[in-house]
Amino acid sequence: MEKIIALFVFLISLVSSNAVELRFYPYELKLRHAFNLASMSRTSTPGVQVEITIDSITGYGEASMPPYLGESVKSVTEFLSLIDPSRLSDPFALEDIHAYMDSLATGNRAAKAAIDIALHDLTGKIMGRAWYQIYGLDPALAPCTSYTVSVDSPDELSRKLAEAEPYRIIKVKMGVPGDRELIETIRRHTDRPICVDVNQGWKSPEEALDNIMWLATRNVLFVEQPLSKSDFEGHAWLRERSPLPIIADEAVQTSADIPALARCYDGINIKLMKSGGMHEAYKMAVLARALGMKVMIGCMTETSCAVSAAAQLAPLADWVDLDGNLLIANDLFDGMKIVDGKVTLPSTPGIGIEKR
């Protein structure tokens, strides 16, 4: 242990004396198929790529900005422009760096996540370890990922289900007209388990319960964010009556949100773009477990950079939804793989990625 501590101190002193290069640039993610949600449809997602270099070692990070987060390429790049690179000179001081970023502006979690991910990638490379190894996690415990299928025409749906064949769990977006027909169509193709994401699409607890009772007979694992994120009482009422677990998504962003949700939900969906990065996401998983809640690790539509960063936490999760990189046509990185439907973590130092 003393040797490990001595090495850690040496590494900190080594990197803290070097100049820091911070680079960032917009990068639009092109979707392979239109992505249909309860409230919108889109064919691309804006993103910003981040690179932090110290002593010729580069860490990569990413900000993905789906519209509901309220961030944009403009807001992310403006925030990143505020950062003094010298404040990143000790990349191991994550708590201090997050405090510094919070002092620059509140919110901006996707922008902060990009810095956080790049710092994790950088420090892992300096230590020569993947972050799941640094966390002390067993990669064999990483669950199978779900694969998202959205509302579409019957022909298009058949094509998407064919693409989803290698995956053991299907994720379905509900809360839009025709969503029950979508489930029935899927059931005519496959009996694989389904997890349902409503994206706040049901309007009342009674409507939600009616749908959940129907879903409970169709091999559904859980229901994600059935009601408005602000409807705490509605979710508490629903949780008492639901035969399926109720998982918070839009209602939870950081660990500060979790205690109030413990009576309303059975679990939480942790996403790096909501939490501000891996540092906070790890805290969230630990706190949720302490409160007896289920843990899901999810993602936005992202390259393999952010998805592989989230995957470092996968062994902590009951479920993972890490297919964001599979949904885009212009990935910049190679990273974690899905083998027989299961998240497989490479031992590549950092967050497990290599730039193409």
Where are these regions (language model features)?
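Catalytic alpha/beta core domains of metabolic enzymes, predominantly
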Residues: 230-235, 239-322
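Sec-dependent signal peptide recognition
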Residues: 2-7
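Metal- or metallocofactor-binding catalytic centers and their adjacent structured scaffolds
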Residues: 24, 53, 58-126
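Boundary at the C-terminal end of the N-terminal hydrophobic targeting segment
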Residues: 17-19
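Conserved, mostly hydrophobic/aromatic
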Residues: 50, 56, 115, 128, ...
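Metal-dependent enolase-superfamily TIM-barrel catalytic cores that perform enediolate-based chemistry
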Residues: 131-242
